[in-house]
Amino acid sequence: MISYIMKKIELPKKIPVFPLSNFIIFPKTTVPLNIFEPRYIDMINESMKSNKLIGMIQPRNLNNEQLIPKLHNIGCLGKIVSFKETEDGRYLVELKGLIRFEIIEEIKSDKKYREFEVNFQNFYQDLNEKKEELKFSDLELIFKDLKSLFEKRGFIINWKELEKQ
C-alpha cells in the first residue's frame, strides 16, 4: 500500500542557480557542498537571508572557451539545511534536495551568479512522501546499477545519504 503526503512548501518562481559539472542532487537527499568562488559565496549569503533555496543543475558540454555555459533544462531545487564558514572564508553547506525544476528563462541582473525563472509543474510528485514496501534485494540491484552508471559518467553521489532513504 502506498500513501502520499504532500509537504507544504512555497515554491519560488525565480531561483539562483549553481551550475556544477559532475554533480547531481536528487529530491529527498542531502549533499555536502564546499563553496569557495566569490560569486557563489554571494549567492549563499543572499539565500541565507531569505528562503535558503538554491537550484543545482548540470552545465552542458562545458569547455574552457565558454564564459557562460549552457545548462541542461532540468535541475533540482535544494534547501540549505546546514551552514558553516571556515577560517579561510569558504562555506561548508549541506543542501537537501526538494523538487526538480525546468528552466523557463534566464533573468538578467547585475548579480555575479545566475538566476532563472523556473517551473515545477511536472515534478510535484517529488514533494510526495511515499511510504511503500520494497524488497531489500530490489534496492540492492537498483543501487548497483545506479552506482555503475554514475561512476562511468564521473558523477559524485552521496550514496550513504541515498541508502538512508
Residue ranges and their predicted role:
Residues 2-165:
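N-terminal low-complexity, acidic/polar interaction/targeting segments
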